[in-house]
Amino acid sequence: MLADMCVGVYKAAMNYEIRPHEFSFNTQESLFTGLGLGFLAATAVVASPSLLDLPITAAEVVRIAMRAGILLYQKSQDLEQLSLDSSLESWTTVVRGLDESIVRGELEKFNKSMETPPSSRIYISVVEPDGSVFISGPPSGLREFFNKSGKVQSAPRAPLPVYGGPCHAAHLYDRTHTEWVVSKVNPEIASRRLSGHPLVLSMGDGQPLAGENARDLFESATYVLLTSIIRWDSVLAAVKKLPHWKQDTKLQLETFRPSSPAVHGLISAVQSEYPDCTVSVDDLGDWIIDNSLEPPTIPIDSRIAVVGMSCRLPGGSDDLQRFWELLEDGRDVHQKVPGNRYDVESHTDMTGRRLNTSHTPFGCFIDSPGLFDASFFDMSPREAGQTDPTHRLALLTAYEALEYSGYVPNRTRSTTRDRVGTVYGQCSDDYREANAGQNIDMYFIPGNYRAFAPGRISYFFKFSGPSFNCDTACSASLAAVQIACSALIRGEADMVVAGGLNILTGSDSFAGLSRGFFLSKTGNCKVFDDGADGYCRADGIGSIVLKRLSDAQQDNDNILGVILGTATNHSSHAISITHPHAPTQEHLYRSVLSQAGIGPHDVDLVEMHGTGTQAGDAAEIESVTRVFSPPVPRRSHPLYISSVKANLGHGEAAAGITALMKALLIFQHNAIPRHVGIKTALNSKFPDLERLNVHIPKETIPWPYRSNRKRYVMINNFSAAGGNTSLLLEEPPVRPDPQGPPQTRFVVALSAKSTTSLRRNLESLITWLEGNRSARLASLAYTTTARRMHHKHRIAVHGASVAEIIQALHQRGSRAELGLLVSKPPSVAFIFSGQGSFYAGVGSQLFKEYPPYREQLQRLDEICQQNGFGSILPAITDTDADVSQLSALVTQLTTVCVQIALCRLWRTLGVKPAVVIGASLGEYAALYAAGALSASDAIFLVGQRTLLMQKLCTANSYGMLAVQGSVDDIRRCVQDRTYEVACINAPRSITICASIKDIVDIQQSLVSQGYRSVKLNVPFAFHSSQMDPILDRYEEIAKAVSFRSLQIPLISSTLADAAVQSRSLVASLFLRENTRAPARFAEAVAKAQDMGLVNSHTVWVEIGVHSTYSGAVRATVADLQAIVPSLRSDETNWHTLAVSMCTLQETGVPLDWNEWYRPFEPEVRLLDLPSYRWDLKNHWIQYNGDWLLVKDKRPRTDQISAATPSLRTALVHQIMEESFRPDGGEIVVQSDVMDKEFFAVASGHKMSGRPLVSVFSYPDIAFTLARYMYSRLKPESPLPAMDFGQVRVLQGLLPRKDRSKPQWVRMRMRADPQCAALQLSISGLSDESSRHVEEKLASGVVRCGDRQSWQDEWADYAHLLTTRIVTLQQMAENGQASRVSRDLVYTLFKNIVDYADHYRGIQSAVLHGLEAVADVILAPSNDSRWTAPPHHIDPITHVGGLVLNAGHATDHHNTIYVMEGWKSMRFAEELVAGELYRSYVKMNPARDGSGFFVGDVYVMREDHIVGKVRGMTLRPLPRILMNRFFDPPDDGDGLATQHIQPHDLPQVQHQPSPTTDSGPDDDPKDPNTGPLTPEVDLPVAPSVEKANTKLVRGALALLAAETGVEPDGLTDETEVSALGIDSLLSLVLVEKFATELQVNIQSSFFLESPTIRELKEYLTASW
């Protein structure tokens, strides 16, 4: 019906638009009426003085119709709830062939015999001229009526499609409803005078509607619609009696349904009375199929609001505040290309002679582009590392921009996920070409191709709107904004996340732009400078959130700026494609200004494209001055011009979005920052800017808001490909200060996806609040609850002031468990309590100050009054009332109505119960909540029952006593008094009934024996024999009501059981039992637990006037998670709800905070709070070497040369590849572990009886390769001393048991031209499908040094070392330290490592705590093919292992210590066999508390230090795991290594990264000296005891290795989805499980296992 009415009004408007001359009506010649909602449509035309007024009047009438529909729906739900899954049932049936009087008599008889509640009566709603009668009422009542009324039952009848609820019902509606429906009409329309307007005849009695203005007309029409029986014959009679008629009157009917009986009846009636009257009928319905009318093509409002933004920009501008500070400080942040991009020295040649080099070493760069929170975005570290950092930072900034905008999915129409799009500009993808392309892996395509950048955002946030990646070169991001605006204006989306992306990692674009003469060789963009010599490339990531302005205002968003227009054109007439063209730019500006309706002189600031090129700056200044500041007419206000590129460089695809964000910050800070691009003098090609009133700000210029002049900024963003994009930005609209809602206590919520981020979020909010103590608490609460996305780790606090919130947050921060973890939303149970705790003014504060609750109670109060029970509102509003003077009828009805209203409130707030339970009187509200009873039925039953009590029972003759004791306790204590058990709430919470005299004696007896008891303030003893007189009569009354199907399970305290279906329950019998039988609450809850309806994780919400059942539930449900009250008598309503909502928020119950704040949203604001604090780790594939320079010029060595290699030692075998160039060199060597000499090295060093290659073999490899490369790169220079440091041991190298096939190890060393640092990586090779796969074993760096300087340094403290050694030896002599012989040393060692004889160099040792000194004599070598023999390096240094694995300072019985690595190893002279050396060490626990030990080993010959191993690190390993770690594979071609892991790293790096912390001797400038990230394959300590199997450990190790997640992160509660296992990675894991674990599983297994715990349990149970 509503749709018909809307169409009707619209059709009328369109019809008269075509024929405007016909829109002329007056009292003498025009007459209107209508049926149903069509009656309201008629009032829209009558209330419109002219055709121009009709659209806005029609819109108001549509709103009236909507509110009327809402009222009908509410009434239908009160009378008979409609469940979501139930079919629609008609509220009206037409009966033909019976006189109205007969039907009315049958209705009266039925309603009386059935004792139908007054509000549920069946009634007549329409009487047609042919005698047909429309009978209306609740569908269940209609069915019952037609089944029992013989006369009507036999008459022809048909249900009508009336599903909206009861209408034309005077017993249900009155003038208050009419006033509510019309109350929101626009005052300008409502006050419109209607003198001389045409008549509107009532469809009830045919009388003209009275009223002096439009509001009166609307109210009268609505009242007729709601209350009057439609009698069309009365309308016809009234029409015939009008004084307008003459014999030859012409009647013109305009109708939408000319064939309807009503129209035919009208024509027949008129022509029978006036035969000469001619009738013409205009069928306005033809318009429906008329396609000649085209919809308007110009939108009413094309203004676009920017509501959120975020950035990652150079110069440390990782957020908007730092960006503004950079602008305000006037910083120029250009720098040399950092080492994490490429080696700037080797890839730059300012002469341009060297192939593929850049001419400039400069750029502007984001500090740490690899930082990313992979787990937040459900990405594995493996996928994150292979994903372009532009994509990752797009995700981060998109989230921050959405957070800034207050985005919550589906909160409003404009935030519906299906209507949100993403558009990003991007013109390069260096990471794909230079970084990820070095080792192409499974995520190469989705991780690097441009389309995936916006697509990944849409996928993560589940946006279904349009997603575009836009490339227009340098103007890509502003072009993306234009696309976004167009999508919004055209209605293709309601919100768009847009931005620009640029991260520079490769040298190719630098080289290409250099050779195209785009780039400056001297530094940053010198915008407007006379010496401008090109632009400076820059990183840039920016994201903004866009909405239509009207939507943003409706959503209560913070509007940062308004885009009035944007356009793009192309410089097709330029002299070349890359050359700018001023006339084309000029045309573009005028187009944008015209689009916005703004004059050029209204614009006071132009944010220029300003690349700092001679051609670009000159063309742009020409076009700008011609349009915005021509000589004539001269501007009256200054025009300021500037460019952000002077600060941050040219961000290329991100340039436009950077300029836009700058302009938005200018509005925020009311100032224009100074321009820093002029380094020498103003460009001499510029016109006289002073004369044109054009100014370049040389200092920060205040630019405040003015009420009489709006601020506009034109933003230019031009493309090297010839495109020009401009955007006109208007300052945000001014909003009045909010007054704030009436609440006195508010909830502030925090959440995160990890505990690390949660703590950081907490700390940042505390810091912000301490600096903003004047912040509005209501807005703070609104921002953190209604305008935030909530994650699984949660904190919620409440307070009445900001100071209270700060204190509460500090208290939470001091807890060991910071917040609650919500793995999934818990189930919710509603408890409806009884009536024993009633008090005056129950819920009065909520009623007075929270409109939705008040409206619910007012609706319920109407039902009370319609049933003749009177109003309950005085008992709520009068807080000083004497409860003892209130009747039982009032208290019981108030209790039930409050419970129903609270139930509706909680449901509106998103708290949906999975099960409900009622106690005593509360069972009525529980039946309502479960769907068995309507609100009207519940109120009717409670009211009738209470009236019977008041009539048939004597008030206050019986009493009820709540006892803290068991039934047996009471029986034992009370033996001489008669009582009945009324309620068993918990095993030791019993309510009994007795006569007043006995109840007093019983209470005294219980108290005397130590039992607490409370007499309930109730006039009757429910569930006792006092109820017997009312039972039969109440059962009869209750037969008028039938239970409907339960929508949710009901735990019945009457039945002490859980009802899932209500079909077996007879309402009258059940309600009789509820009145008389004891309420067995505890048994019911226990039964619900047995049935699985509730458990310890269920959150209980008590709905009643006070919290009375929390103790009972806790006594019955073990380990109860939470129970919260709705109201309490001892605290304010706001306090109770705040505490309860805190608990619900923390436990994960979905709360619709937006709905909570909806009534007061205009009075709160979205605050600019600190953004989400990420748990960042560095995911970065470092570009290594020079392949971008040499490309295919490098010599290939695909086949192993047959010639004798030029390098061969025991450990270094075949040269696979070598290249030596002016910019450095690289060598790749391959060795066979199964080679006799190599295997002998491993055999001399066994762990768990298995050969293991000593890590002290690696110095020999490192020094051998380093000397070889040095001699090749610097053949004329003598070999220097060398230091092998930054060694990280990633895996142990164990020879396979099967020695029949080779086991390859590959060594790769890279060197810079000066050989200052030679980087070594050692990897094992496995053969997977004939494809060699490398797994890194160790890494380190050889540095060249000066032997003499080392000796000079050591000489300064050699005497101190000697003194300490002497002291230790004296302590050994005195028994204060332990002296250990050679045999005992290696006997002790044998528990861990079994050394061959030539490794056993220690002759004796002295141990004291973590300190030791050893005498060492090195064994001779059998041949000379060693550079640093392992059997020399190992014994000279393994004194550190002796201290930890054999001394008394550590628990070496349960723990062993294995080598992790060292920072530096240097020897000032060669070690000589047979010489006596002395090794000293003191190990110290690592400062980070990891259990690692670190120490320096000093090697002395006589009194001189000849060597030092600095920072030698050993890690602990449980001794029980030795066999697992050092048990090599039996066969196969796979890599025969077992993973031994170092401690957790602060970052995840996928190649050497300069962000790794360096030691004091490390060269921080070298980009290739960072440690390599270990593969992760540690055993994870089991937390599920039954899952501690080899299979589970292997599975977890595989998961860790393939996802890149740290093993410690694989806890039982870890969600598999958070590991980033997608469909692609799941296929890899399936293959790995099959080949390595011999377990065959489906790929969906990883996508369907929620947590690691379930994964473990599945594996344990299945295998």
UniProtKB/Swiss-Prot annotation:
Gene that specifies this protein: ktnS
Sequence positions bearing O-(pantetheine 4'-phosphoryl)serine: S1623
Record: active site: C474 (for beta-ketoacyl synthase activity), H609 (for beta-ketoacyl synthase activity), H650 (for beta-ketoacyl synthase activity), H1245 (proton acceptor), D1434 (proton donor)
E.C. number: 2.3.1.-
Lineage summary: Eukaryota, Fungi, Dikarya, Ascomycota, Pezizomycotina
Every Ketosynthase family 3 (KS3) domain range: 301-731
Protein name: Kotanin synthase
PKS/mFAS DH domain boundaries: 1213-1523
Domain text: Multidomain protein; including a starter unit:ACP transacylase (SAT) that selects the starter unit; a ketosynthase (KS) that catalyzes repeated decarboxylative condensation to elongate the polyketide backbone; a malonyl-CoA:ACP transacylase (MAT) that selects and transfers the extender unit malonyl-CoA; a product template (PT) domain that controls the immediate cyclization regioselectivity of the reactive polyketide backbone; and an acyl-carrier protein (ACP) that serves as the tether of the growing and completed polyketide via its phosphopantetheinyl arm.
Annotated region (N-terminal hotdog fold), positions in chain: 1213-1349
